[in-house]
Amino acid sequence: MKNLFNKIFNPEKYLADKRLKIIEKDKKIFKEKYEKQINDVQKSLKNKDEISFLHAGHIGDIINALPVVKEISKSHKCNLIIQTNLPSPDVYSSHPAGKFYLNKKIYDMLYPLLIKQSYIEKVEIYNSQPIDINFNLIRELPINLCFDNKRYWFHIAGIQVDLSKKYLEVEDHANLKNRITICRSLRYQNPFIDYSFLEKYDDIYYIGVLEEYEILKKIIKNLKFYECKDFLEMAMIIKSSKVHIGNQTLGIDIAEGLKSPRIVEVSPYFPTVQIHGENGYEFYFQTHFEKYFNVLNNK
């Protein structure tokens, strides 16, 4: 009854009380369920020579956690354990893993890129192995995730990394070189942006999902499609690209790791991707998109 009275006659107090209840609830959840797990990470880093990381995806999130893995590998042997078939609450039809963060098919495509990294000792599917750092906690903790998603993993491991440095290692692609490449998911598209100006450029390749390509080809009529056999090949193509363009999706996450020329279309509704280091730009608006593209394309 008191809450109803305040809601009607004292809305400021009602909102303050509501906010306080949320805070107290979050504190209780953290204390009872997560504080020990966060503290135990530091004990493992201090006392162990070998560290096993658990990650269930999405694919880009696994790539974005690699700077932390690479940093820890300077003093520890590092194993990356991938959990497949963890149900995702955000199911959408175009996602290649369907109702999961990551399925076995996607794992098989990701494995060659992960095992290529010299700082990772081994990559395995999760089968109840002992885990020291559980990156999956980031989706459970009572915190707001609307910040740079490459920094999520800092808050699980307690490790701060210079994100301007490369953290992916691949060779150049043998055939597809010096092209404009695009990978633009149907999620997180910016409604202020139009890609049609790219139609005047030759040799533009889409290297993502076929459904996404078919939609973008209606806008860029001369857009070509290249089907990557796995994400290692995708990374090799991105490394060899003149410019890679994308929104908040795997292509940009890979380009960030390589520090190759890249431009990211940022979602105005969930801006969790930021550029770090050389050869990269991010944009919200069309005029900046075209400006940054010209800067990189004319280098």
PLM-predicted stretches and their roles:
Residues 1-299:
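Catalytic machinery of carbohydrate-active enzymes
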